[in-house]
Amino acid sequence: MENRYAVHPEQVKRFTTEELRRHFHIPTLFVSGELKLYYSHEDRVVIGGVMPSAEPLKLDAGDFLRTEYFLERREIGIVNVGGQGTVTVDGEAFVLEHKDFLYIGLGHEDVQFASASGEEAKFYLVSATAHQAYPTQKAAIAELTPNHLGEASASNVRNLYQVIHANGIQSCQLMMGITQLETNNTWNTMPAHIHDRRMEVYLYLDIEEDARVFHFMGEPSETRHLVLANEEAVISPAWSIHSGSGTANYSFIWAMAGENYTFKDMDFVPMDQLR
C-alpha cells in the first residue's frame, strides 16, 4: 500500500509538475494478477485497483491498516471497469458487469475478487472509515436512471449517475457515482466548485489511447493542472477545485468522503475568481 500524505495549499503553490503528480496523481491501478492500494491522508480514504487473472485475489489489510481485516473499521465502494467479474463477500457472490457498482459495509472479513473467462475484470475501489454497518448492495448500471446535465453550447452535456449517497445506496460517509460525457462534449465540473468538508477522488475512464484529459486543481486563485490518460486517478483535497477538459469525451468515477453527507454541500466559484 502506497502512502500519500496530505499537503497544505501554500506548499502546492510552489510545486513543480513532477511534485504535483507525485502527491496527487495515481498512475497505476490495474496490473494483471495484482491488488494495488493507495492510502490518502485526505479523510483517510484508500484508493485501489484489483485485476484478477487466473486466481482470485483477496482484499487484505496488510500491515499498513493495523487491523485484523480490511473492513474491520471501514466501508468500501467498488466499480467494475473491465470484463465481467465476481466479488464474493463472506461467501455471497455478486456478479458485476462493466460499470456495475457494489457497496460493502463495515465488518465483512472475507472479500475476494475474480474474473470470468475472457476479458479480465478491473475492480476500482474507494474505501472510507466507518462507524456503523450498512447492508451490502449491488447497483447495475443498466438499471440506474441518470441525471441529464449540461448544455451543448458549453461543451458539457453529460449523464450523472449518483449511486452511493443519501438517496441511494446508504453508507456512513462514502459517496460514489459515475459521470459520462456525451460525444463532442469535453468539460466536467465547470463552473468549478469546492466542498471544504469533503475530499474527492476522480478516476478517468473511456479515454482513447491518443487522447488526454487536462484536470484542473488547486485553490481557485492558484489553479494548476495535471494531464491524465485512461484509467488514471487524481486525489482532490477539500480546498481544491476539481474540474477537467478532454481532447475528446470521456467518463469519470467520482468518490467523496468527509464530514458532510449532503451531496449539494458545495461552494461554486464564479468564473471571474479563477486564476
UniProtKB/Swiss-Prot annotation:
Q: Give me any GO biological process, just one.
A: D-galacturonate catabolic process
| Listed pathway(s) | Glycan metabolism; pectin degradation; 2-dehydro-3-deoxy-D-gluconate from pectin: step 4/5
CDD domains cross-referenced by the UniProt entry: cupin_KduI_C, cupin_KduI_N
**Enzyme class label:** isomerase
Its cofactor is: Zn(2+)
Which InterPro entries has this protein been placed in? KduI, KduI/IolB_isomerase, KduI_N, RmlC-like_jellyroll, RmlC_Cupin_sf
Which SUPFAM superfamilies would you find in this protein's record?
Answer: RmlC-like cupins
Keyword Zinc appears in the UniProt entry: yes
User: Which residues are listed for Zn(2+) binding in this entry?
Assistant: 193, 195, 200, 242
Note on how the cofactor is bound: Binds 1 zinc ion per subunit.
Q: What is its EC number?
A: 5.3.1.17
Q: Which GO terms describe its molecular function?
A: 4-deoxy-L-threo-5-hexosulose-uronate ketol-isomerase activity; zinc ion binding
Catalytic activity reads: 5-dehydro-4-deoxy-D-glucuronate = 3-deoxy-D-glycero-2,5-hexodiulosonate
Keyword field: Isomerase, Metal-binding, Zinc
Query: Briefly, what is this protein's role?
Result: Catalyzes the isomerization of 5-dehydro-4-deoxy-D-glucuronate to 3-deoxy-D-glycero-2,5-hexodiulosonate.
> To which protein family does this belong?
Belongs to the KduI family.
Q: What is the name of this protein? A: 4-deoxy-L-threo-5-hexosulose-uronate ketol-isomerase
Organism per entry: Bacillus pumilus (strain SAFR-032)
The gene is kduI
